Amino acid sequence: MCEVFRRLPGTAPGSSPPAPATHRLRLLGRELRVRRFMIFCRFWAKMATNDAVLKRLEQKGAEADQIIEYLKQQVALLKEKAVLQATLREEKKLRVENAKLKKEIEELKQELIQAEIQNGVKQIPVPVQSDTPVQASSAVSTSVIQSTSVSTISCSIKEHSKGGGEEKKVKEKTDKKGEKKEKKLQSAAPSADSKPVDVSRLDLRIGRIVTVKKHPDADSLYVEEVDVGEAAPRTVISGLVNHVPLDQMQNRMVVLLCNLKPAKMRGILSQAMVMCASSPEKVEILAPPNGSVPGDRITFDAFPGEPDKELNPKKKIWEQIQPDLHTNAECVATYKGSPFEVKGKGVCRAQTMANSGIK
């Protein structure tokens, strides 16, 4: 029986077919070579792609390092700028404080000089120090000061050793000198206190309460804005909560003392005082005459004169005048019997309180 077979590649025509085992080995070897070649190609392709990725990563890392370094520099600059600004602010603050302290020192020095002059102490002018002092000159000046201080101390010891009689003479001479200097100062000083201490020193005016409310930090005080004929109303603090209802304060015409030194009352500056008839049991606001307008001046026929611009609290002028302010038997406000008068319009009075004090 004839055996028919397919001719394999690589067999010559008419040749006999190869043995089956040899043929399989050849096929396997050829397939292995093909697979090795494919694996080798894939490996080199992967290596090429990995190199590109690594290069990109290295480039990104370098860029990130540069950005981080730049940010560090910016943070350092910002810190330096903040420290510089804080230093400048502190320096400015210290300069202002130093200027205030210098001013206070100069004021205290002037007060001390005036007190020494009044007590008869002889004043010796102090040499002004130059802007560019030399160490040698400063040393000489200190030595001179030390020598003068030593000499003055020795002289004082000698004077004390001479006895009490000479001390008495020296004291009498200094007292006489002090009296002469005081007389000169009194004659040279402006005659501000030559005015009599009476009601003419008070700036009493008519005012109208524009707004009123309770003090935020005090239950017994009102805070009022009062028109006294000036460009802007004045803020006035009054202790009238327990005596006058709030609705009766609004738009009310009042008498104001306008030249007291402004003072803070529970944190709010009061620029005037509402005048009231007052007793331990009762308080009534003084009523101006009909037809009065804000800014009208209150005068006293028996006490003419112009009021002080501002009463000096050290002189106690208000404290000396106030005890003579009273309402008379007809409830008219008076000073030593002379009524509170608005020229051409009438007198000021309390509603019901007769023969009571005014403050």
Swiss-Prot record:
Modification N6-succinyllysine occurs at: 316
Bias kind Basic and acidic residues: ranges = 157-185
- Region Interaction with HSP90B1, annotated ranges: 100-241
Q: What GO biological process terms are annotated to this protein in UniProt?
A: angiogenesis; apoptotic process; inflammatory response; positive regulation of glucagon secretion; translation
Q: Which domain of life is it from?
A: Eukaryota
Locate the region Required for fibroblast proliferation: 52-92
Q: What's in the keyword line of the UniProt record?
A: Angiogenesis, Apoptosis, Cytokine, Cytoplasm, Endoplasmic reticulum, Golgi apparatus, Inflammatory response, Isopeptide bond, Nucleus, Phosphoprotein, Protein biosynthesis, RNA-binding, Secreted, tRNA-binding, Ubl conjugation
Pfam families from the entry? tRNA_bind
Q: Which residues carry this modification: Phosphoserine?
A: 187
Q: According to its record, what are the GO cellular component terms?
A: aminoacyl-tRNA synthetase multienzyme complex; cytosol; endoplasmic reticulum; extracellular space; Golgi apparatus; nucleus
Query: What SUPFAM superfamilies does the database record attribute to this sequence?
Result: Nucleic acid-binding proteins
Q: Where is this region: Disordered?
A: 156-196
Could you describe the post-translational modifications of this protein? Cleaved by caspase-7 in response to apoptosis to produce EMAP-II.
Q: Which GO terms describe its molecular function?
A: cytokine activity; tRNA binding
Ranges for the region named Required for endothelial cell migration are 163-239
Among PROSITE patterns, the record links this protein to: TRBD
* Localisation: Nucleus; Cytoplasm, Cytosol; Secreted; Endoplasmic reticulum
- Location in chain, cross-link Glycyl lysine isopeptide (Lys-Gly) (interchain with G-Cter in SUMO1): 184
Query: Where does the tRNA-binding domain lie?
Result: 198-299
Give a short account of what the protein does. Non-catalytic component of the multisynthase complex. Stimulates the catalytic activity of cytoplasmic arginyl-tRNA synthase. Binds tRNA. Possesses inflammatory cytokine activity. Negatively regulates TGF-beta signaling through stabilization of SMURF2 by binding to SMURF2 and inhibiting its SMAD7-mediated degradation. Involved in glucose homeostasis through induction of glucagon secretion at low glucose levels. Promotes dermal fibroblast proliferation and wound repair. Regulates KDELR1-mediated retention of HSP90B1/gp96 in the endoplasmic reticulum.
Fill in the subunit field for this protein: Homodimer. Part of the multisynthetase complex (MSC), a multisubunit complex that groups tRNA ligases for Arg (RARS1), Asp (DARS1), Gln (QARS1), Ile (IARS1), Leu (LARS1), Lys (KARS1), Met (MARS1) the bifunctional ligase for Glu and Pro (EPRS1) and the auxiliary subunits AIMP1/p43, AIMP2/p38 and EEF1E1/p18. Interacts (via N-terminus) with RARS1 (via N-terminus). Part of a complex composed of RARS1, QARS1 and AIMP1. Interacts (via C-terminus) with SMURF2. Interacts (via N-terminus) with HSP90B1/gp96 (via C-terminus). Interacts with PSMA7. Interacts with TARS3.
Question: What protein name is recorded for this chain?
Answer: Aminoacyl tRNA synthase complex-interacting multifunctional protein 1
Taxonomic lineage: Eukaryota, Metazoa, Chordata, Craniata, Vertebrata
Q: Which gene encodes it?
A: AIMP1
